[in-house]
Amino acid sequence: MANTKSAKKKIKVIRRRTIENKIQKFKMKKAIKEVKKALLAGDIEKAKELYSKAAKLIDQTAAKGVIHKNNASRKKSRLMKLINKYAALSTPQPEKKAQ
């Protein structure tokens, strides 16, 4: 337990910041889930549109120091990789002729 007045104030600040960080992280995770949900539904265009919003939220979360910038980069990279994978599966591939 905090003994000094300044330490008690610091606890209040820490609690407030923790709540703000959790809210920011929740928004980011929700945006990522929406992209994945659109991919599972087979809507590639909607997923790409939602990706731009998710990437923005991921960058904001990293800028606020809630997650590390490398973690943010990894999340965006994996999400884009997943979108590209589903996009490749949905487009028909040209058949190769046997020689």
Swiss-Prot record:
Give the intrachain disulfide bonds: none
Q: Which GO terms describe its biological process?
A: translation
Cellular component, GO, one term: small ribosomal subunit
Tell me a Gene Ontology molecular-function term this record carries.
structural constituent of ribosome
Q: Which UniProt keywords apply?
A: Ribonucleoprotein, Ribosomal protein, RNA-binding, rRNA-binding
**Residue intervals passing through the bilayer:** none
Keyword field contains Iron-sulfur: no
Q: Which InterPro entries match?
A: Ribosomal_bS20 (IPR002583), Ribosomal_bS20_sf (IPR036510)
What does the similarity note say?
Belongs to the bacterial ribosomal protein bS20 family.
NCBIfam families assigned: S20
Q: So what does this one do?
A: Binds directly to 16S ribosomal RNA.
**PANTHER family, per the entry:** 30S RIBOSOMAL PROTEIN S20, SMALL RIBOSOMAL SUBUNIT PROTEIN BS20C
What is the name of this protein? Small ribosomal subunit protein bS20
**What gene name is listed for this protein?**
rpsT
